[in-house]
Amino acid sequence: MKKYVCKRVLISAFTLFVIVLIMFLLMELMPGTPFNDEKLEPQQIEVLSRKYGLDQPVLTRFWKYLTNTLRGDFGVSYVLAKNMSITDLLANRFPVSIRIALLSMLIGTVVGIILGTLAAVFHDSILDPIVSVISMLGNSIPSYVFALGLMYFVAYKAGLLPILYNAKDSLRSIILPCLALSTTAMSNIARFTRTQMIEVLGSDYILLAESEGNKKVRVIMRHALRNSLIPLM
């Protein structure tokens, strides 16, 4: 077991190193400098490049970048916030990001379970193919495309929700991102719940519970749904 864990850790570390190297080289191959948008004179750009160490050899800068990153020092921002630590920038935006991520997962899980359960219970009706189509579209359409559609129709055309984040109206501001990010999780969970629920509903103990006179809703909620969600958990 230890050998397997060590092997996986080494593979993960090597993969992460390769990704960091590729991203660094791609940034290096991009034309211009981070200061091109400032409309500065060449002499001023040269001074700034020397100040931030951008005039050093590529290998030197990569080694410095790698060692600083391992220490948690990501340098300073050249564009977004002048001379502000990137660590501080990430810290300022992390609470909103984690809130959106958690709410997206919650929405996707709850809605996915509801849709999957309905599709399984009414799998002989038109509701089943409708849920299947929704799941297929949720997996086929990237979340950013869905986000653009929400921004255009819900925010721009209907004016129901803001497009940009507003700290004074943070709750309404994160509704669109949460909906857009929840589509993939919702689709996968709905399809998984449907499959498990159909299998559980055909079990002997479910048929026995129904034959004892229990209401179908009670059987589904207390027996079928609980057991079908065990693999999901």
Describe the role of every protein-language-model region:
Residues 1-12, 40:
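Transmembrane alpha-helical segments of polytopic membrane transport and secretion proteins
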Residues 2-3, 90-127, 143, 167-233:
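Alpha-helical transmembrane segments of integral membrane proteins
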Residues 16-63, 79-81, 158-176:
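Hydrophobic alpha-helical transmembrane segments of membrane transport/permease proteins
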Residues 28, 37, 117-121, 152, ...:
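Transmembrane helix-loop junction
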Residues 46-50, 64, 68, 88, ...:
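Short amphipathic alpha-helical coupling elements at transmembrane boundaries
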Residues 55-113:
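An internal, D/E-rich "acidic patch" concept
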Residues 76, 84, 132-191, 195:
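Membrane-water interface segments at transmembrane-helix boundaries in multipass membrane proteins
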